[in-house]
Amino acid sequence: MRILADENIPLVDAFFADQGSIRRLPGRAIDRAALAEVDVLLVRSVTEVSRAALAGSPVRFVGTCTIGTDHLDLDYFAEAGIAWSSAPGCNARGVVDYVLGCLLAMAEVRGADLAERTYGVVGAGQVGGRLVEVLRGLGWKVLVCDPPRQAREPDGEFVSLERLLAEADVISLHTPLNRDGEHPTRHLLDEPRLAALRPGTWLVNASRGAVVDNQALRRLLEGGADLEVALDVWEGEPQADPELAARCLIATPHIAGYSLEGKLRGTAQIYQAYCAWRGIAERVSLQDVLPETWLAGLQLNPGCDPAWALATLCRAVYDPRSDDAAFRRSLTGDSATRRAAFDALRKHYPPRREITGLRVATGGQAELQRVVRALGAQLV
């Protein structure tokens, strides 16, 4: 097999070395010419895999190390008989850790008690669904809007988007980018909806940039709106709006899901799908390649404050403020320089582990145990 992989996909050799020749390119450089002699294509969300790129090529399998598939022309895949796989849920936990880090940063700035807020989660799939479980496990009030899931689960606890926007103090977006269809999400938060947000609302977008109208949001913030914003995704990536970023409390270069586990899990999942397509046995597993965590464990005193424990556990694995600082330093120079810097920050992103790898002892204190379980850490 002739395999072409995005150069930023980790451990391609570990999983695919015995399957043929492997060539690597930057994801944005993968085009029609690059696919002329390729059987298997492995990509991330930065590569548009379209009819124009694939027509006439020998590509028979496409794997994307992402949850979303809006960069894949699935209609053409079906027409051309091209097998494909995404990696649903691969980086979901990393995104949840990112959102928790943003909430802690916002609470610190606002002097707010996270337990007293009402949370609105828009999109309850792989990422949003996990976030809802964590927030409710902590005993916090959560409203959920997910029309497609509500149609499948008519007895579920769902609310309309209008009610969520009217009642939630914190809004976290986790929808795919759908430009058409029954439930389009492009500019789901458009100018009228953004303007109608309650004063003091916190908005987090770690889904797709165009789910929020970036220009409308910038105008709103420039006008002095009482709104705290954390953005990890941007319209027109890798070109992020520096004026919008300057008005966000947290601004990062699409790295919410960039945990080490998430990256390796994505490669492992498309390898599993590839093996199923080929009808061959898997020779490598995620556990074979996942290194030990840097932090072996934490011992909490039974008398410690649960809110302090929550913040300590979350920040033990991730604090978005370091990524925010690095991103802001990159927002200088001309457009080409900023675009290159955006991709460079993602390419050279340092290792980050997930909270699920933390082993935490609580001395048997029930409230601390509840916090540890809700976060998904390992209780010992």
From Swiss-Prot:
Coiled-coil residues are: none
Q: Sorted alphabetically, which Gene3D superfamilies does this protein's record hold?
A: 3.30.1370.170, NAD(P)-binding Rossmann-like Domain (3.40.50.720)
Q: Does the keyword Cytoplasm apply?
A: yes
Q: Which SUPFAM superfamilies match?
A: Formate/glycerate dehydrogenase catalytic domain-like, NAD(P)-binding Rossmann-fold domains
The UniProt keywords, alphabetically, are: Cytoplasm, NAD, Oxidoreductase, Pyridoxine biosynthesis
Is Acyltransferase there in the keyword field? no
What InterPro entries does the entry give?
D-isomer_2_OHA_DH_cat_dom (IPR006139), D-isomer_DH_CS (IPR029753), D-isomer_DH_NAD-bd (IPR006140), Erythronate-4-P_DHase (IPR020921), Erythronate-4-P_DHase_dimer (IPR024531), NAD(P)-bd_dom_sf (IPR036291), PdxB_dimer_sf (IPR038251)
Please state what class of enzyme this protein is.
oxidoreductase
Leader sequence range is none
Q: Where does NAD(+) bind?
A: 126-127, 146, 175, 206-208, 232, 257
Q: Where in the cell is it found?
A: Cytoplasm
- GO-annotated biological processes: 'de novo' pyridoxal 5'-phosphate biosynthetic process; pyridoxine biosynthetic process
Can you list the GO cellular component terms from the UniProt entry?
cytosol
Subunit organization: Homodimer.
Record's HAMAP family? PdxB
Main function: Catalyzes the oxidation of erythronate-4-phosphate to 3-hydroxy-2-oxo-4-phosphonooxybutanoate.
Under what name is this protein listed?
Erythronate-4-phosphate dehydrogenase
> Which species expresses this protein natively?
Pseudomonas paraeruginosa (strain DSM 24068 / PA7)
Gene that specifies this protein: pdxB
